[in-house]
């Protein structure tokens, strides 16, 4: 009796975001101050991800000039749609819970520099947000200080130039079981060769799992 491989006949879902990203994004972006994290984040929000409602949770959102582009965009979009498309949230206790999210639209929740705050909210969004059609991005300087539940539920990791060898080895040990450490260091050296360079690891796409930046496939 022939056994049919139904996985081979399953239709591929239409691409929702940039090719480097899965359709359901649970991403961590790490790198030291000034490495380029915020500029990449703005590009993801404004160019590379599809969303209808954005929740930006950042204690210093009112002090960062780089977020002015989002405030201007929100002002213009609000005039057209009659409602705000971006919520700027400075207190993590005011961030939406999973139950608050509208699963009928594309939600994006971003946590930027919230390491010193209560981590229950981002942990729950990383764990359950996909059931409410919600993508999530967590931006931080130190990978090992991010709560384990967030790291365990992450499916995209972006690592910027400037991290220390301890963090690099921790990333390799967790994410890159299919290559030895020397090869991983060679892979990361591409990020070190250019200003604001970074690597992207996507667990959901084995054919292009490792990228230099967003576009160049490694390996």
Identify the meaning behind each predicted range.
Residues 19-20, 45-48, 149-150, 188-193:
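A general structural signal for short secondary-structure junctions and capping/turn motifs
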Residues 179-218:
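Conserved AAA+ ATPase small/helical "lid" subdomain
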């Amino acid at each position: 009796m022939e056994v049919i491989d139904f996985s081979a006949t399953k239709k591929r879902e239409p691409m929702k975001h940039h090719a480097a990203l899965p359709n359901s994004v649970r991403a961590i972006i790490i790198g030291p101050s000034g490495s380029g994290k915020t500029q990449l984040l703005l590009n993801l929000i404004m160019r590379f991800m599809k969303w209808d409602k954005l929740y930006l949770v950042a204690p210093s959102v009112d002090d960062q000039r780089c977020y002015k582009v989002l405030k201007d965009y929100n002002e213009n979009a609000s005039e057209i749609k009659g409602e705000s498309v971006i919520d700027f949230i400075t207190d993590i206790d005011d961030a939406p819970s999973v139950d608050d999210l509208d699963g009928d639209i594309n939600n994006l929740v971003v946590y930027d520099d919230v390491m010193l705050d209560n981590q229950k909210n981002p942990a729950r969004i990383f764990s359950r947000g996909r059931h409410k059609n919600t993508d999530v991005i967590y931006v931080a300087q130190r990978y090992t200080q991010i709560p384990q539940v967030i790291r365990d539920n992450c499916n995209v990791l972006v690592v910027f130039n400037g991290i220390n060898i301890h963090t690099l080895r921790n990333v390799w040990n967790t994410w890159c079981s299919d290559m030895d450490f020397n090869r991983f260091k060679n892979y990361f050296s591409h990020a070190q060769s250019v200003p604001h360079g970074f690597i992207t690891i996507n667990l959901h796409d084995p054919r292009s799992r490792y990228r230099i930046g967003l576009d160049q496939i490694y390996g």
